[in-house]
Curated annotation (Swiss-Prot):
It comes from Porphyromonas gingivalis (strain ATCC 33277 / DSM 20709 / CIP 103683 / JCM 12257 / NCTC 11834 / 2561). GO terms for molecular function: 6,7-dimethyl-8-ribityllumazine synthase activity. The keyword Cytoplasm does not apply. It catalyses: (2S)-2-hydroxy-3-oxobutyl phosphate + 5-amino-6-(D-ribitylamino)uracil = 6,7-dimethyl-8-(1-D-ribityl)lumazine + phosphate + 2 H2O + H(+). 5-amino-6-(D-ribitylamino)uracil binds at W31, T65, F66, E67, C89, V90, V91, F122. This is 6,7-dimethyl-8-ribityllumazine synthase. Pfam families: DMRL_synthase. Pathway: Cofactor biosynthesis; riboflavin biosynthesis; riboflavin from 2-hydroxy-3-oxobutyl phosphate and 5-amino-6-(D-ribitylamino)uracil: step 1/2. Transmembrane segments: none annotated.
């Protein structure tokens, strides 16, 4: 397991670019909001900590994880952001629905990254159990939202190199 010995929230603060002049969009799924809200909070707290102004963080809620692709494209095109963080949570159930949603959102976000000029960060938890999701949304494995925000800052900084 990749996280067996790692807290997702551990990172080298000095390696993260300052976000002072950046605008960051966050698309957040309402489904499994008990997980996505802490992920969003982790992302926002990290962005603020690295200098992104609260006025330059644009949050767009959508009903579910599948809708994150559309919301991410909307944020990139309509709000002129430097990066988008897509936050969602899909927990495996008894039907193939999990596979369809995970595959669809992964392909959608990948396509946005290939076709667009704004990095879209995959902050979607795809877990076997709700406990695994909780452990990655502020639990023993840290907060994946924090990791997604760090990635957004680093990717947005690529244009500035």
């Amino acid at each position: 397991m990749a996280t067996a010995y790692h807290n997702l929230s551990d990172y080298d603060y000095e390696s993260v670019p300052c976000g002072k002049d950046l605008r960051i969009g966050i698309a957040v799924a309402e489904w499994n909001h008990n997980i996505t809200e802490p992920l969003m909070k982790g992302a926002i707290d990290t962005l603020l900590e690295h200098g992104v102004s609260a006025d330059n963080i644009i949050v767009q809620h959508v009903p579910g994880t599948f809708e994150l692709t559309y919301a991410s494209a909307y944020l990139a095109e309509q709000h002129e952001v430097d990066a988008v963080i897509a936050i969602g949570c899909v927990v495996r159930g008894d039907t193939p629905h999990f596979d369809y949603i995970c595959q669809g959102v992964t392909q959608g976000i990948t396509q946005l990254n290939v076709d667009g000029f704004v990095p879209v960060i995959f902050g979607v938890l795809t877990t076997e159990t709700m406990l695994q999701a909780e452990e990655r949304a502020g639990g023993k494995h840290g907060n994946k939202g924090t990791e997604a925000a760090v990635t957004a800052l680093k990717m947005a900084g690529l244009e500035r190199i």
